[in-house]
Amino acid sequence: MKKIAVDAMGGDFAPQSVVEGVEKARNKYPDLRFMLFGDEQKIREILTSDKNIEIIQTTEVIDMNDEPVKAIRRKKDSSLVRAAYAVKEGKADALFSCGNTGALLAAGLLIVGRIKGITRPGLLSTLPVLTKEGGAFNLLDSGANADNKPEQLYQYALLGKYYAESVRNIKNPRIGLLNNGTEPHKGSKLTLEAHNLIAADSSINFVGNVESKDILKGVCDVVVADGFTGNAVLKAIEGTAGTAMHLLKDTIMSAGLLGKIGGLLLKPSIMKIRNKMSASQYGGAVLLGAKAPVVKAHGASDAETVYYTVKQINDMLENDMLSKFTDYFNKNV
Amino acid sequence: MKKIAVDAMGGDFAPQSVVEGVEKARNKYPDLRFMLFGDEQKIREILTSDKNIEIIQTTEVIDMNDEPVKAIRRKKDSSLVRAAYAVKEGKADALFSCGNTGALLAAGLLIVGRIKGITRPGLLSTLPVLTKEGGAFNLLDSGANADNKPEQLYQYALLGKYYAESVRNIKNPRIGLLNNGTEPHKGSKLTLEAHNLIAADSSINFVGNVESKDILKGVCDVVVADGFTGNAVLKAIEGTAGTAMHLLKDTIMSAGLLGKIGGLLLKPSIMKIRNKMSASQYGGAVLLGAKAPVVKAHGASDAETVYYTVKQINDMLENDMLSKFTDYFNKNV
């Protein structure tokens, strides 16, 4: 029986979408338990049944404008900080929030804490492989760090491997290193050193360097990057996809009658593309290297996204991903 | 009267598209002169008139698989190396190729040479602002370097400013620094230092940090980045746009009869988006910081792209961009 500590107040549509998504997940996964941290009255207005759900009243909320580390230190009775302490104290097995990303990362690092041997936990995101039905890849670190060292990129290769095995059920996942060219001799000082470290570990199915133009085509299952570049690439992909969809919509709307009819006939197809590109079914971003799953879903998450993210957390807990991490790093570092 | 040294053999459709594009530009710009380096016989098979065009016979070609620096050193009679020497020796004012990017960069750095005071020239690319008709922005460095220092990013801010003023006729162009957040306190060691250097120069219209998700929306005219991140972002944007267009096409093709009719009715609109996203009318990538314009058009360039790239080179020469660079850096460095 595993328990998830949920920041019920984080996110644009909180607590509504969080509570609805949690209830849906509760109905699907009878072995899961939930601790909902937040404004009890507001939560109860939405909650239909408190089966397997415990509500913990908190009085503060960390919002999107709060400076992360400061907020974690000062808002001691916030839904996020209280949820993080529940994990730290062993009352819950995972931390989940749709709120301020920086604050969640800070709570993960400073309250939940790092696995011994992992110097800089990294944020793992899941993105769609656009050319393959249902395909996906992970990008790690997608932004927990602004500066990384080669050894940390090597650790991301290992963390990403265990994640892909545990949660995505991929045997021997293909690990690629994000670089400015595919040839082994190409790269920055950082990627050249990281390349050698990863290549030297025969337990990793290393496919070598990958370029950002190819990752959406599924050239590997896990893309390892430093947090600065990973973040820039993630946001470039999201920005381009979002802008392209807007452009398509605007173009159809201003295309005259025939164009509008065309748009109408194509609507189901365009919705299919939109869904493929949308993040909701791929779950949340995971801070890998923390002592427990620390998971962030998008601020604009609806109940569906919350549900899928709980499913993802359940996969991590069911397959005991954290024990695999700690076993490995306690033995090897 | 300005002269452009053209590598007529570089690119997927060379010399055909190169010669056709040059002739079109020759007809448009009577003050320009061209030196076409390559296989004279092949060039003459395409050339309709040699007015203002001189052909220089060369016997070697650097292809896409050649290792750049090695190729520059060994293939002394290649069309690219001979064209670069023409610039170095003052016989031509600019270097243009659609061939191997690395080799062109190496020729720019090692043969044409750097402007005094500029330690690491950067590659400037032009991308479309998707939300604004005809809008565009520059990204610099988009991949000439794998590792950059803060002072170099500051130099890119200056080089980008002069470029936008000279070629794009933008008064007081808005310069942004690519970063992992817009707040001034965010960033890597590199971007934090670069931010301070750029912000301290009151001659620069610095709009602060920009994120890769916003640059396609035109938040600034010039995006300054280190070459590794700039390259990753450029390729992520190109990869996402390309994959999205493919996905749209595939979805229409498999959408059944109504969907296909819809696709047909929408075809003009979709072509409009494609054109907006396509690189051809935005010209080539420019190695800024070299002693003369060193310009690379896409390997798959058609005659139209070659024509637009010559127009872009003409703008740089007409507005004497290089003198502005050298005046500034000779005075200030």
Swiss-Prot record, chains A, B:
Named in its record, the pathway it takes part in is:
Lipid metabolism; phospholipid metabolism
Gene Ontology MF, one: phosphate:acyl-[acyl carrier protein] acyltransferase activity
The reply to whether Methyltransferase figures as a keyword in the UniProt entry is: no
GO BP, sorted A to Z:
fatty acid biosynthetic process; phospholipid biosynthetic process
Group of enzyme by EC:
transferase
Instruction: Give the matching Gene3D superfamilies.
Output: Isopropylmalate Dehydrogenase
> EC number(s) for this protein?
2.3.1.274
What Gene Ontology cellular component terms go with this record? cytoplasm
Q: Report the subcellular localization.
A: Cytoplasm
What are the record keywords, sorted? Cytoplasm, Lipid biosynthesis, Lipid metabolism, Phospholipid biosynthesis, Phospholipid metabolism, Transferase
Q: Name one Pfam family in it.
A: FA_synthesis
Reactions catalysed according to its record: a fatty acyl-[ACP] + phosphate = an acyl phosphate + holo-[ACP]
Q: What is annotated about its quaternary structure and interactions?
A: Homodimer. Probably interacts with PlsY.
> Which family is annotated?
Belongs to the PlsX family.
> What is this protein's function per UniProt?
Catalyzes the reversible formation of acyl-phosphate (acyl-PO(4)) from acyl-[acyl-carrier-protein] (acyl-ACP). This enzyme utilizes acyl-ACP as fatty acyl donor, but not acyl-CoA.
Protein's recorded name: Phosphate acyltransferase
Q: What is the lineage of its organism?
A: Bacteria, Bacillati, Bacillota, Bacilli, Lactobacillales
